[in-house]
From Swiss-Prot:
Chaperone in keyword set: no
Protein name per the record: HTH-type transcriptional regulator BetI
Pathway: Amine and polyamine biosynthesis; betaine biosynthesis via choline pathway [regulation]
Gene3D superfamilies reported for this sequence: Tetracycline Repressor, domain 2
Disulfide bonds: none
Known function: Repressor involved in the biosynthesis of the osmoprotectant glycine betaine. It represses transcription of the choline transporter BetT and the genes of BetAB involved in the synthesis of glycine betaine.
Any Pfam family hit: TetR_C_6
Domain (HTH tetR-type): residue spans on this chain: 8-68
InterPro entries the UniProt entry points to: BetI_C, DNA-bd_HTH_TetR-type_CS, Homeodomain-like_sf, HTH-type_TetR-like_transc_reg, HTH_TetR, Tet_transcr_reg_TetR-rel_C_sf, Tscrpt_rep_BetI
Residue ranges the UniProt entry marks as DNA-binding: 31-50
Length: 194
């Protein structure tokens, strides 16, 4: 008989275990049994909650995106100026929960998987559109809409690129350095603007 109220806790444990397992292996070449073992639950329970590896992977991506969105909304809520909003968007993308070694490796794996999975590709497109629209909203208060869109596209590419570089490197991710690079890029692009 399942314990009442345990499902959300077990789901979260499995999602966290999926991030760790995928991050450690650097690929989606993992089994539900390996993820379940990492979470300390039975493979049958993992299948019961998620119905299979693909659904567990998608739930893991959704979790990371939801966490990013919640952190972003909280950070933006504390800003007063467009430049503060831009800084908050950048900082959240390199927060400790997102820019950890295993999470970075998991994100890189999701990008590779998107070439074969329409569901994964759709989630990554949603992420890219949200990042772009959040940046454009703040940037167009400082420059033209056309320039704001181009600057946002460049900043998004830098953020993704820094994830890729850190996924391939042996050193621990340096969030402060990554934030400074993206902020410097935007500052240079805005020189001479309002």
């Amino acid at each position: 008989m399942p314990k009442i109220g345990m499902e959300p806790l077990r789901r979260r444990e499995l999602i966290d275990a999926a991030i760790r397992t995928i991050g450690q292996r650097g690929s989606l070449d993992v089994t539900v049994a390996q993820i379940a073992h990492e979470a300390g639950v039975s493979p049958a329970l993992a299948h019961h909650y998620f119905g299979g590896k693909d659904k567990l992977i998608l739930a893991t991506m959704r979790h990371l995106l939801r966490e990013l969105g919640q952190d972003l909304n909280a950070a933006i809520g504390r800003t007063e100026t467009p430049r503060e909003r831009i800084a908050a968007i950048i900082a959240v993308n390199f927060s400790a929960s997102q820019f950890a070694q295993e999470t970075i490796a998991a994100w890189l794996t999701f990008y590779v998987h998107a070439q074969q999975s329409e569901d994964t590709r759709r989630l990554l497109r949603i992420y890219a559109r949200r990042l772009h629209s959040n940046l454009v909203f703040a940037l167009e208060q400082l420059t033209s809409r056309e320039r704001a869109s181009r600057i946002a596209e460049g900043a998004g590419a830098m953020i993704d690129g820094l994830y890729i570089r850190h996924a391939l490197g042996a050193d621990a991710p340096n969030a402060a350095s990554a934030i400074a690079l993206v902020e410097d890029y935007i500052a240079v692009q805005l020189m001479g603007e309002k």
